[in-house]
Amino acid sequence: ASFKKGNNLFSSTFSGIEFTFDHYITLFTDTPYMQWYLNTFILATANMLISLIVVTMTAYVFSRYRFRGKRNTLMSILVLQMFPAFLSMTAIYILLSKANLIDTYTGLLLVYVTGSLPFMTWLVKGYFDAIPTSLDEAAKIDGAGHLTIFIQIILPLAKPILVFVGLVSFTGPWMDFILPTLVLRSEDKMTLAIGIFSWIASNSAENYTLFAAGALLVAVPITLLFVFTQKHITTGLVSGAVKE
């Protein structure tokens, strides 16, 4: 439909359909689509990097350190996954409003990172637990500290689970509609989801094929990421979910 002339999604016949790139040209010339794309890419990349750092360090602490309350904290993390995210929407809005973080990427990133932290921490911890502690002990004999062990030993061995965490953290903001709608207000800060929705809504039912073109371009980066990282995704998810 995105390559078909006109504004109709469907055609009565397949013969005689004329293909065109006009809808894609219109996206980048007559709409702020490129700005929405850039906003979403920056937000998704920032969330991926921050989540990787926070999740891996937190999971390493739970996997390798012993401290009071560790078991109860892990159980609390697991229990938090039982509640739907929608239950916290009102509280999130009030907290961000009190902190003057409404209409900021900082507020949105805080929600994304903290929202995925419990599940990702539990998953990565399971993967770290499967890495023999004898490697840590051998490194300590050679004079390595916890930071050196974490960076030079644990992270290289945990590549599959890191790829999985990074991909999930990237696709979350890329595809999300609810949270950006709740937090963002300015047109120049819109993400792809709310940008396309607001633009199509303001133009009634006249641009379905243009919407199809925009939706197709949204799917391209995610599809490519899954194609090139699917081996690591499967390995990381299965290994992180199994406790030995």
Regions of interest found by a model, annotated:
Residues 1-244:
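A structural signal for multi-pass alpha-helical bundles of membrane permease subunits
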